[in-house]
């Protein structure tokens, strides 16, 4: 197994003084108005991330007037929303999906997770680079390929080449955010799995409401809550990549405490920026933006156990998937993952750090195929 390289974990580099097309206008007055509507660039986001310059609320409210009541100036004069308000966050997501990803009909039932789009699409950009790296180095020898990292940030292509990619999203939730963004950003095809039939019914409704998604997203129900890939990957399936955002917590109590902690941090952050601190207790847990259904938030053993199970099962499907990947929120869980990956015989392991504002997370990627086998997979991809 190739030892995880620190180079693969390099943090994204942000360019200072980057001029945004959104901030250009024909007059100084127009410049001031547009600048006021756009938040500061989000540090650490991938160079191809459309949201590096924040949110253009003027455009967002124009395409989705439902967002308008939630948008207010903050103490710095920038337009923003209350990110502790789940309805505001849902309205923002719907507007972003419509403006930037041409998805017109998107909704989720009350009480389901409403993920922030900038961080979610970052995952897709980085795994695109992982897949592009396979093709870029497919003609190199295994010795040359050993330890090969994801291309550094400053070499990421501005206009990525088209690749016929089939991806598997484990635990897609009711929002199906990864398939939606992957289809509209890169033209990938997806299979999306979940243990919750309500979530999958909602995903089907989203697909049926958007012609651009038809025929590109298939949903599969996981009937065994103890399994990850088994029962989902069929004998004739071949996936270029698998994605997963594992349940973070080990119990409902831990999940509830985490939600309350995040809500408190948001309130304190708003207070530090000049907002009047008016803590409000939600009527129920489902009203927290950090709420969610059991399968979305927690599982027995938490993230560490989920990753262990995923790695163990991945060996069974070693030749059916080019790359397996997962987000890893807790850095301390990586060492156990590396140990298990060595035990099951993974040939290459990569860890890709992602920075989103003050939040650090990482993508763990592994493959059971040799570099030359991965090169052939890319070359003969259907």
Swiss-Prot record:
It is an enzyme of class 2 (transferase). Residues 8-24 have a biased composition (Basic residues). Keywords: Cytoplasm, Methyltransferase, rRNA processing, S-adenosyl-L-methionine, Transferase. One of its GO terms (cellular component) is cytoplasm. Its main location: cytoplasm. Gene3D superfamilies: Vaccinia Virus protein VP39. One of its GO terms (molecular function) is 23S rRNA (adenine(1618)-N(6))-methyltransferase activity. Its EC number is 2.1.1.181. InterPro entries: METTL16/RlmF, rRNA_lsu_MeTfrase_F, SAM-dependent_MTases_sf. It is found in: Cytoplasm. It holds the Pfam family Methyltransf_10. GO terms for biological process: rRNA base methylation. Residues 1-53, 269-288 are annotated as: Disordered. It comes from the Bacteria. Belongs to the methyltransferase superfamily. METTL16/RlmF family. Specifically methylates the adenine in position 1618 of 23S rRNA. This is Ribosomal RNA large subunit methyltransferase F. The lineage of its organism: Bacteria, Pseudomonadati, Pseudomonadota, Gammaproteobacteria, Alteromonadales.
